[in-house]
Amino acid sequence: MKCVKKGLLVMIMFVLSANSFGQNKKQNKKTPGQAAFYSNTYPNIFLEAGYKQKDIDEKLARAYHDIFEGPNRVYFEVGDSMGYVSDVKNHDARTEGLSYGMMIAVQLNKKDVFDRIWRWSKKYLQHQDGPREAYFAWSINPQTMKKNSEGSASDGELYFVTDLLFASNRWGNNTGINYYGEARRILDAMWKKDGTGNIYNLFNTEHKQISFVPEGDGYKWTDPSYHLPAFLEVWALYAKDGHEQFYKDCADTSRVFLHRACHPVTGLNADYSDFSGAPHPTRWMPVGFRFDSWRVPMNIAMDYNWFGKDKSWQQEYAKRFQNFLRSKGINTFEDQFNLDGSRPDVILQAGGFKKLRHSLGLVSTAACTSLINKEKNSLDFVHALWNAKLEPYEDGYFDPYYDGLLYLFSLMQLSGKYQIIKQQAH
């Protein structure tokens, strides 16, 4: 009898221990340590919203086709080995779109597209000597090959470096391009820029924040949509240039900066900000939430998903932002605002059109915040994106470049296809 009781006691203890282990596992899934970097799991919000995997895959493939291969594509191949992404409506190619194209290519494992864009960008936009050495001219006319500016926009280099680090991790450095070497060239040159020729580090080293431009007065303020703490975590992991702690500090600073830059009620941010987070007025446009700002919710969702180091604030932000847009009509909210949510007096023009509209780009990035906001009605934004189309608006305006790229990025995020590409055996 004692043996039976002893056996029962052991079994009960085993069951309780197993239950406790199972509960701990469930709890661990909810901790910040279980962000995608740690779990290698990326949520598929479309699947959670009730869509079939086959339909999700088809929607993503169609979007890629439309933007990179279809009759309204913004990607164009040049000769046997190069290609570029063009902001067609503005008749230029810019580091923004080129680096976006490379990010999409490395995420979707399209090596030829990645290599073509990099070769074109390096040949026609990267400075090979002088104070700007290794930085990129931010805009060029792809028909005349005349640069619209010699200067850099810091987000272009931010994306280029991250693209190249991911490419190195995915494909290695012995397939024709030394991706890691190219990333290090940009970073090593960046750290040598001390103001000579009025050219600086991409990051204001005093404030540990990315600059609007690494030149002149533009080094002293910033653009909230350039704040991608997730990318800086990637740099800290894979750049291996001796500045890991600086990149970690910049990531943490960006998170705190976004707390200050986003309105406490609407969640809206200004296109440009001082390092304090206060709006920064410019000579070309008064303060407002406009095209650059559309990227902020997408960037915050990425950081939440990839590293999960600021979840509490990010969850509150997502609720505020979605609640504000919902108050304007989930199928009608416009695309430019004053930070308090009122209509702006000055409208920023796009492609010859100066009007407010319900823009696909903002519909897309707003849906990304459903990665963060777990309230059931948050899926309304996911359904709105699913039903949206990359096509001309009623007045004829059509932007497969900015609308299209943000649309594709958002489909990738919400389907779990926008990931940290870790080092792989080659």
Regions found by a protein language model. Give the residues of each.
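Hydrophobic h-region of N-terminal signal peptides that target proteins for export
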Residues: 12-20
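Extended ligand-binding clefts on enzyme/binding-domain cores
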Residues: 27-62, 91-95, 130-135, 149-155, ...
